[in-house]
Amino acid sequence: MAHHSCGATHGVMERCDLACTSCYLGEEANASRPIEEAEVCRQFDALREFLGPQGKAQITSGEVTLMPREELGRYIRYAIDIGLDPMVMTHGRRFLEEPDYLRDLVELDGLEKISIHVDSTQRGRQEWSPFCTETELHPLRDRYARLIRDTRRQTGRRLHAAHTVTVHPRNLAQIPDVMQWMVRNLDAFRMISFQPVAEVGRTQDQSIENLTLDDVWEKVCGGLGTKINRDAMHFGHPECHIVTPVVVVRSGERFIVLETARKGKRWDRSYLRRLLDQVGGYTVRGKSRMTNILGITSLTLRNPLLLLETFLYGIYRSWGNRRELASVLLRAVKRGHLSVRPLVLVIHKFMSPGELDTPIGQERLAACTFKVPVNGKMISMCEMNATELRSKLYPRERIRKAG
């Protein structure tokens, strides 16, 4: 079974064609050539050893879609072949300009996961202005949602999409607007990650003084119209991130958010734990929907008591939300449409340089669940970006490429 953590590449393509006002890359990034393919594969090998089978590996660096599709495709195929679950991290501009680029990654190279970064820090986009709001970027987000739907339809393949948003002083109050857009587009995106600014790399935006995870979480909940338990699941240090899965039942503009583990509800947590113990090792990559349904059903049938509990728990949860569900279902009867979609809510708070050597910073580094392979070691992404380590790698990478 895979470790409960995530890893990432570096040096694959440090260059980026945007000039985001919040950027973890160093000043020399755009002059740094990509490292050799063999070295990238060694990074994947290290990630596979560290993360285990189906480990979540982000193919990231600067903007990796600046590479030829064939080259990025080779990295995706290699990661899959050695047993990783790769996700391409991108601002996605090339996908809009060349839709075939994404289609080929999905159809020819087996890509199943992407994360698209859109927010008001992204200087260089045609849609960007110094004072643009997140709401003004919704038409751009709509284009990506259509692209994802079109790619699935044209290829007949699975494509899971996440949305990444940097949180800075100017857009903190706009998070509810982004969440409301997200609810309307859960058929395209099923995960959203908010990442408060860290004063690293070539970042120009200031971090928000004394901003806590709870401050951001309050804005997320505001957009969903309900207070959600932030402690449904735990990964790493509690000051690093929040990861909370929910289910959204929606008809038109009316929706209800169903939590996986409500605060103070013991049965929620104990049932979730037993369910994950039973099916947590099952992987869906490379299998058809029917195969996955049969596989998960088979696992559940091996534990008749859990199957019975699932039935009873479903009644219990439906009764607890009967009024809200009735309102949505009545709307669905009138409109003839009802959707039930999963949504994973993520907040990831990277550290600035001044935080690393504090007692809490050292605790966070020791508990880190997001690492990159550097010189034979797995290094926290915070250590990679909040020190000179990333920049120190640039000259060596150029020398290796030239040699």
What are these regions (language model features)?
Residues G55-Q58, G110-S115, P139-E239:
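Conserved C-terminal portion of the radical SAM core fold
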Residues I208, G225-T260, L393-A402:
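Catalytic cores of nucleic-acid editing and processing enzymes
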Residues G73-R77, L102-V106, A145, M179, ...:
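Short amphipathic alpha-helical segments and helix-helix/interface helices
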Residues P68-L72, E98-Y101, E127, L172-V178, ...:
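A short acidic (Asp/Glu
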Residues D17, V64-L66, M87, G92-L96, ...:
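Conserved radical SAM core fold
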